[in-house]
Amino acid sequence: MRVAIAEAELARGSTGNNPWVGCAIVSPQGELLGRGHTLGPGEDHAEIAAARDASARGFTVVGATLYSTLEPCSFHGRTPACASSIAARGVARVVIGMRDPHPRVDGEGIRILREAGVLVHEGVCEPEVRRQLGGWVIEQHPYEPIHRAQALPQPQRVALLAELYGVAPSRIEALLAHRS
């Protein structure tokens, strides 16, 4: 996932209204087969760029593990759905940093992958990925953090707000108590 996170940084500022996503594809033996990041609007998303990189290096991704900082997209927009493409290429396992908050994705990419028999792990390095994509989430999906926080039990909500604002949980608890 660290390679994918580094790849995502290469895309920051060049993806239009798309998120800056990074991807790495690794063989069952742990060899890096390909890496990529989201290109400009209408161009390859990170997962496809990484698969093309693997192919250009002479590797197949059948049976490989794909690491992506964000859940692969599930709908055909300017580009085909990445989740379907990943499954069709024979990737065995997908490791995701965080779910895509886009209303047309949010878990749908994961569902497509699982229905195709791909093993999916979510939440790997999620705090780091959330911080990395924070600007995009706020810009493109401004209410997503609020909706997610409201759904959490009080202790988890306090921990989340403390992390987001970089303050001690006791300060958040005091603010919430003062507001009541």
Predicted regions mapped to residue ranges:
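Catalytic-loop motifs flanking and including active-site residues across diverse enzymes
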Residues: A46-E47, C82
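Zinc-dependent deaminase
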Residues: M1-R12, G77-S180
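A short acidic/small-residue loop/turn micro-motif
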Residues: T38-G42
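Short beta-strand scaffold segments in enzyme catalytic cores
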Residues: W20-G30
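Mobile, glycine- and charge-enriched loop segments
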Residues: I48-H76
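Cofactor-binding loop segments of dinucleotide-utilizing enzymes, especially the Rossmann-like FAD-
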Residues: P28, E71, R99
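Short loop/turn motifs at secondary-structure junctions and domain boundaries
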Residues: G13-N17
